[in-house]
Amino acid sequence: MFSYRHGFHAGNHADVLKHMVLVQVLEHLLQKDKPFWVIDTHAGGGLYDLTSNYATKSGEFEGGIGRIWPLRKAAGTPVAVKALLDQIAALNNGTDLRWYPGSPQLAAQMLRQGDHLRLCELHPTEIGLLRDHFAGVKRGVSIEQVDGFTDLPKVLPPPPRRGLVHIDPPYELKDDYKKVLQALRAARERSATGT
């Protein structure tokens, strides 16, 4: 346990797909002028340096975000791809690709005042990175060193009764697959209108 480090995999093809969907769901929730919560059960470090030893050792980002990064200025780029690339470009000041946002960073960039981001992470190194990354953020972010699977039922439904739950464990343990299903069932029982 705790051998998984997302820095090796940040920006890979699976991250790109997951984050395209996340940005689209967030954009949909933002259409209503009502606050909502984002709960990330396995937040990771929040932000990843693609020039780090982790990222360059695996090189996985090259087949993911590295492959579509040139499309940010291309005509005809699909809307979902463009929306994600715009978020990543804002983080990189529109220039070279160095920083890749994890789900917490993407959500933080998009949320409004009154919305809330709850981040759960159990990994001792990742929680430190997450806390460091969000150290200057005083509004609307809570970070908990807890098992996101067991924490989720305790915080549902969120106070505004609108929310998005993001569940993406490292699948380091075989029972993570079973725990995802159990968490989804528990979430559905506690908050039938959640996303």
Identify the meaning behind each predicted range:
Residues M1-T195:
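Class I S-adenosyl-L-methionine-dependent methyltransferase catalytic core
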